[in-house]
Design a protein with these regions (language model features):
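A generic structural signal for short beta-strands and their flanking turns/coil linkers
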Residues: 34, 104-106, 136
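Long, hydrophobic/aromatic-enriched structural stretches that serve as scaffold segments
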Residues: 2-42
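Conserved short histidine dyad/triad with adjacent acidic residue
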Residues: 1, 108-128
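Ligand-binding loop in jelly-roll beta-barrel domains
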Residues: 27-64
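Nucleotide/phosphate-binding catalytic cleft detector across ATP-hydrolyzing
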Residues: 169
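Surface-exposed beta-loop interaction hotspot
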Residues: 55-112
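Conserved small/polar residues in nucleotide/adenosyl-binding loops
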Residues: 159-166
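Short, conserved beta-strand element in jelly-roll/cupin
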Residues: 2-10, 108-110, 130-155
Length: 169
């Protein structure tokens, strides 16, 4: 899935010309992005028309799904969580779409001083809707530029003994 984070670009994918896509010049405008689903093994190209940032999101998937444009007008900014775990989500590609067989794509906007990706969760079993088996990758952008973020990754097997540090050695 190609996601136009910022800027405008002409995109060709899977033998189709998708035209010039991109409607936001800064990700923090919080407008939904233009995106293209590119099937496994299909070629794509991009010709930037302005300065642009594009997320190339991929994971091994099942075949047979046609290329498609994921329109911004079908993506809403949704509030998720509460209190200091409140965040705002653009669901770009989710489980309810047939082509999302091994990859979900979201944009998360987290207010200053709040937490995201909490409570702790995993994606190592296929037991939908409780747990989904898929890849998870994070790409962080910070606003203001001199701000910072913190991310902690854990593996549940590390927390089965009294001393997780012993498991790391």
């Amino acid at each position: 899935i190609l996601v136009m984070i910022e800027g405008k670009a002409e995109i060709n994918a899977a033998g189709q010309k998708w035209g010039i896509l991109g409607d936001r010049m800064d990700v923090f405008e919080k407008k939904p992005p233009h995106s293209i689903y590119v099937p496994n093994g299909q070629k794509w190209s991009l010709n930037a028309k302005t300065d642009c940032v594009v997320a190339v999101c991929s994971a091994p998937g099942k075949s047979g799904h046609p290329a498609r444009k994921i329109e911004p007008n079908g993506i809403k900014l949704i509030k998720r969580g509460s209190g200091s775990n409140t965040r705002y989500i653009h669901n770009i590609a989710m489980e309810d779409e047939d082509y999302c067989d091994s990859l979900l794509v979201t944009e998360v906007f987290t207010p200053d001083g709040y937490w995201s990706s909490y409570p702790s969760h995993r994606h190592d079993e296929d037991d939908f809707p409780n747990i989904t088996y898929l890849e998870e990758t994070y790409y962080h952008r910070i606003n203001p530029k001199n701000g910072f973020g913190m991310q902690r990754i854990y593996h549940c097997l590390l927390y089965t003994s009294p001393s997780p540090r012993d498991q790391l050695q």
